[in-house]
From Swiss-Prot:
Record's keyword terms, sorted: Cell inner membrane, Cell membrane, Chaperone, Disulfide bond, Electron transport, Membrane, Oxidoreductase, Redox-active center, Transmembrane, Transmembrane helix, Transport
InterPro entries: DiS_bond_form_DsbB/BdbC, Disulphide_bond_form_DsbB, DsbB, DsbB-like_sf
Disulphide-bonded residues: C40-C43, C104-C130
Topological domain spans for side Periplasmic: 31-48, 90-144
Keyword Cell inner membrane: yes
Role noted for this protein: Required for disulfide bond formation in some periplasmic proteins. Acts by oxidizing the DsbA protein.
NCBIfam families according to UniProt: PRK01749.1
Protein location: Cell inner membrane
A Pfam family matched in the record: DsbB
Molecular-function GO term, any one: protein-disulfide reductase activity
Record-linked SUPFAM superfamilies: DsbB-like (SSF158442)
Organism: Shewanella sp. (strain W3-18-1)
Protein name according to UniProt: Disulfide bond formation protein B
GO BP of this protein: protein folding
Gene: dsbB
Length: 175
């Protein structure tokens, strides 16, 4: 078993994924409440995608020695990172090519059975506009940084998918 496979089968790899997502969620709340940067609806959707990566890490952390658990975690990771990248690219396009006809909505379009913006308004209620560019770091906007973040999550997923899918050297039906 290679070192990468051993790491993918360990709790620490999934803990690292979870910790990274928690750090990103904490940074989002810092930007919102300390720096007073209002999140737009696309930002809220990206926040939800990061939460999906957090859930993926928690799934993988429960029992990383079992292939089925690793596959469930990796699937959630891939879907969330892909969806987040799609949203981040759409937001970058919206900010780089502003149009009065192509704006984002004021309220998120969550399912009626799961109105997260009503249940958790402090975290999931958008208060900003998608075309606002209030913050830059190294001349890169927050939306562009999120493209980097979600792309990195996907590249790491690509590096880990084969070790995640591989079984352990111990004979077992589930490993």
């Amino acid at each position: 078993m290679t070192a990468l496979t051993r790491f993918a089968h360990s709790r620490s790899s999934w803990f690292l994924l979870t910790g990274t997502a928690i750090g990103l969620e904490a940074a989002a709340l810092y930007f919102q409440y300390v720096m007073k940067l209002d999140p737009c609806v696309m930002c809220i959707y990206q926040r939800l995608a990061v939460f999906g990566i957090l859930v993926a890490g928690l799934i993988g952390m429960t029992a990383p020695k079992y292939r089925l658990i690793r596959i469930l975690g990796a699937s959630c990771w891939a879907v969330s990172a892909t969806w987040g990248l799609k949203l981040a690219l759409a937001l970058v396009n919206m900010q780089n090519n502003p149009s009065p006809f192509a704006t984002c909505s004021f309220l998120p379009e969550f399912p009626t059975w799961m109105p997260l913006h009503e249940w958790f308004p402090a975290v999931m209620l958008p208060t900003g506009m998608c075309t606002d560019l209030p913050w830059r770091f190294m001349d890169v906007t927050m939306a562009e940084w999120m493209v980097v973040v979600f792309s990195t999550f996907l590249v790491i997923w690509l590096l880990f998918i084969v070790p995640i899918l591989s079984g352990s050297t111990k004979p077992s039906l589930y490993k």
